[in-house]
Every structure is written in C-alpha cells, then in structure tokens.
Amino acid sequence: MKLFAAFLLLAFSSAAQAAQPIVATWHLDHQELNGEKKETEEMILRVTPDGDKFLFAFSVPINNIAFVSLSYSAKLDGTEADVKNARGNKVGTVEITVPSPSHYKLVMKGDNRPNTTVVLTVSPDGNTLTSQSDSTQAGKPMHLVQTFTRR
C-alpha cells in the first residue's frame, strides 16, 4: 500500500511538472527596452523538468551549436536557486513563484548586477512566451519586454 501511494505521488508530481505550460523550447522573436524596439540576436530558452525543479537554459547559437550562456534549476515555490554562467560559476540567485496559471514571477539577484523582477506569461494558445523585466541601472528604471515563440 505504501509503495502504491508513493507511486501515485510520483506520478502526480511528474504529471504536474509536465502540465506546466512554460516547459518548451522558446526562440526570441523581438524585444523592446523602455518602449523602444531593439535589435535581437538569436537566443533560445529551453525549460525542462529537472527532478522536482525546472531547468531554465538560455543559449545562443555559435557555428550552429547551441552554447548555454546562463542557466538555473529551480523549484516553482520561491525557493532560492543558483544562477550559473557558461562556465558553471554562480553569478546570482533566482526565486520563482507561480502567482496564477501560465504566469511565473522571478526575482533575480547577484553581485554587481541590478536586482531584477521578471514576469513570464505563456499565451492562452501556449505558443508565445512574453517576458517583462524591471530593474534599475545607473539610477534609471529599465523595462525590458521580450517575446518568444514555441518551436
């Protein structure tokens, strides 16, 4: 009986993770900084289940190879997790919560980096991810909007 209960819990946890609409490979389409359209270099965000966490891996293609430049594996309950650069060095922390379905709130902190609040929203059809981030740099407020497409 205990084994069956453990199996059900594991199955439910796996199903809950798979049901997260953010799990996908997202390609950056365009971005705006403080309302002005900015040039967009190719960037890919892959979000995958990672045990009881989710792995967020940002990559840029170099010679047709996806080079991971930033990543973090975090629970969606606000637990602090490390943000790592391409070399695996910690460059900050992230806390992720899910205030409502298809909405993810991130608080990112790091030495020599501005604290940043990010809201990720998956569209109702599941094909678009919008990232809105706010920070203060050199005393000026910065609002970045990035739009990704599921591929």
Please report, for each region that a protein language model flagged, where it lies by residue:
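Positively charged n-region of N-terminal signal peptides that target proteins for export
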Residues: 1-4
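N-terminal signal peptide c-region/cleavage motif recognized by signal peptidases
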Residues: 11-15
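Hydrophobic small-molecule pocket/channel-lining residues, especially in calycin-type beta-barrels
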Residues: 18-151
